[in-house]
Amino acid sequence: MEAKAVARTIRIAPRKVRLVLDLIRGKNVGEAIAILKLTNKASSPVVEKLLMSALANAEHNYDMNTDELVVKEAYANEGPTLKRFRPRAQGRASAINKRTSHITIVVSDGKEEAKEA
């Protein structure tokens, strides 16, 4: 059985979020939370909050035991880009792309759900 949580349009570049997600993918949920608390990255609190949301979804929606859960999937896709301009020398301007992320975390207890035919 799986439970999922999604955070959309987070103002951190996906490339930076993936560094944190790579640390927790495949880990036990308790271990993943401990790793996130000690990780000194800007996306760490956002990912931790999202993981807690996935835990709450698993417990509330599917009556899963939160002690057995494992981070099955964790990925960050690119969200909409905010385009800004920075003034440069001699009247020019350069484009600055403020990137956003859509972050998804899926937790699983390792048991397969019964498929209906």
From Swiss-Prot:
GO molecular function: rRNA binding; structural constituent of ribosome
InterPro entries: Ribosomal_uL22 (IPR001063), Ribosomal_uL22_bac/chlpt-type (IPR005727), Ribosomal_uL22_bac/org-type (IPR047867), Ribosomal_uL22_CS (IPR018260), Ribosomal_uL22_sf (IPR036394)
GO terms under cellular component: cytosolic large ribosomal subunit
A Pfam cross-reference name: Ribosomal_L22
Record's keyword terms, sorted: Ribonucleoprotein, Ribosomal protein, RNA-binding, rRNA-binding
CDD domains tied to this protein: Ribosomal_L22 (cd00336)
Record carries keyword rRNA-binding: yes
One GO BP: translation
Its job: This protein binds specifically to 23S rRNA; its binding is stimulated by other ribosomal proteins, e.g. L4, L17, and L20. It is important during the early stages of 50S assembly. It makes multiple contacts with different domains of the 23S rRNA in the assembled 50S subunit and ribosome. The globular domain of the protein is located near the polypeptide exit tunnel on the outside of the subunit, while an extended beta-hairpin is found that lines the wall of the exit tunnel in the center of the 70S ribosome.
PANTHER family from the UniProt entry: CHLOROPLAST 50S RIBOSOMAL PROTEIN L22-RELATED, LARGE RIBOSOMAL SUBUNIT PROTEIN UL22M
Assembly mode: Part of the 50S ribosomal subunit.
UniProt similarity note: Belongs to the universal ribosomal protein uL22 family.
Name by which UniProt lists this protein: Large ribosomal subunit protein uL22
